[in-house]
Amino acid sequence: MEVIKITPRGYCYGVVDAMVIARNAALDPSLPRPIYILGMIVHNKHVTDAFAEEGIITLDGENRLEILEKIERGTVIFTAHGVSPEVKKRALEKGLVTIDATCPDVTKTHRLIEQKLADGYDIIYIGKKGHPEPEGAVGINPERIHLVETPDDVERLSLKNERLMVTNQTTMSQWDVADIMAKVKEKYPHVEMHKEICLATQLRQEAVAEQAKEADVTIVVGDPRSNNSNRLAQVSEEIAGTKAYRIADVTEIDINWIKNAKKVAVTAGASTPTPITKEVIDFLEQFDPNDPATWERERKVPLQKILPKVKTKKEE
């Protein structure tokens, strides 16, 4: 069986930056304890488990404001997905030390939205309902930012403002965004369009669209809550025409998916640790459908190998 290692795949710079920021916080004795992450720093349970070993507590819940109310003291880290101005304000009111690990691409979209709001625009925001990135973006001004996820949501809009802009969550399928933006343009011909798919997401989706065509099946390594991982599986099926399965790690591979495959493509979400993906690739490369001894799927990657290394200041 041939394994097609789709390139590029895995970590993006925004994820690595967020993890380094959180790791440095764990190593900084001057920061007040406990140290909390407001939601998952990135959408990968292996990463949050690794941070738990470093003494950083991940708090999750329906929304960021609700989670914040659970924190009485210490330090709070805002995740790569960004937060609303209201969350930042409330954290300061509670006297918490805050560390912002928002992805620069998300920050760029927030600034664009803020500028357009100041110029009198209403915003149509294409995003996944219940995902923290749209929560943070819509939270800038819930009265004038309108979240849509499907063309049907666009149909239900009733906006009178002549000043309209449409933009999007950075990790959406670029094909879905294009379809929904076309629907918005059809309904509101005067709308300004700002496509904000981040470059890392775009390149990974395009790689799957092209390279997965040759495969019998695609394995996407990524957490079930990772939107960009789920979109890679969607791209494989809808654009490349190749059946795809998303797995958190090697233990979730079903032998029935691969036992008759001649070519298996592998990619990984932007928040998937490289050692977790490597373990999947190693398993597939040694897999023999006729030898059950090669079918064992056990995750052996230690948690301390999950997080990126950080430079520590040498004592003088």
UniProtKB/Swiss-Prot annotation:
Keyword entries, A-Z: 4Fe-4S, Iron, Iron-sulfur, Isoprene biosynthesis, Metal-binding, Oxidoreductase
Binding-site residues, (2E)-4-hydroxy-3-methylbut-2-enyl diphosphate: H43, H81, H131, T170, S226, N228, S271
Cofactor: [4Fe-4S] cluster
GO MF annotation, one: metal ion binding
Annotated binding of dimethylallyl diphosphate, by residue: H43, H81, H131, S226, N228, S271
Catalytic activity: isopentenyl diphosphate + 2 oxidized [2Fe-2S]-[ferredoxin] + H2O = (2E)-4-hydroxy-3-methylbut-2-enyl diphosphate + 2 reduced [2Fe-2S]-[ferredoxin] + 2 H(+); dimethylallyl diphosphate + 2 oxidized [2Fe-2S]-[ferredoxin] + H2O = (2E)-4-hydroxy-3-methylbut-2-enyl diphosphate + 2 reduced [2Fe-2S]-[ferredoxin] + 2 H(+)
Annotated isopentenyl diphosphate binding sites: H43, H81, H131, S226, N228, S271
One annotated GO biological process: isopentenyl diphosphate biosynthetic process, methylerythritol 4-phosphate pathway
Any Pfam family matching the protein: LYTB
Catalytic residues identified in the record: E133 (proton donor)
Keyword Iron-sulfur: yes
Cofactor, free-text remark: Binds 1 [4Fe-4S] cluster per subunit.
Pathway: Isoprenoid biosynthesis; dimethylallyl diphosphate biosynthesis; dimethylallyl diphosphate from (2E)-4-hydroxy-3-methylbutenyl diphosphate: step 1/1; Isoprenoid biosynthesis; isopentenyl diphosphate biosynthesis via DXP pathway; isopentenyl diphosphate from 1-deoxy-D-xylulose 5-phosphate: step 6/6
PANTHER family the UniProt entry points to: 4-HYDROXY-3-METHYLBUT-2-ENYL DIPHOSPHATE REDUCTASE
Function statement: Catalyzes the conversion of 1-hydroxy-2-methyl-2-(E)-butenyl 4-diphosphate (HMBPP) into a mixture of isopentenyl diphosphate (IPP) and dimethylallyl diphosphate (DMAPP). Acts in the terminal step of the DOXP/MEP pathway for isoprenoid precursor biosynthesis.
Name under which the protein is recorded: 4-hydroxy-3-methylbut-2-enyl diphosphate reductase
Organism listed in the record: Geobacillus thermodenitrificans (strain NG80-2)
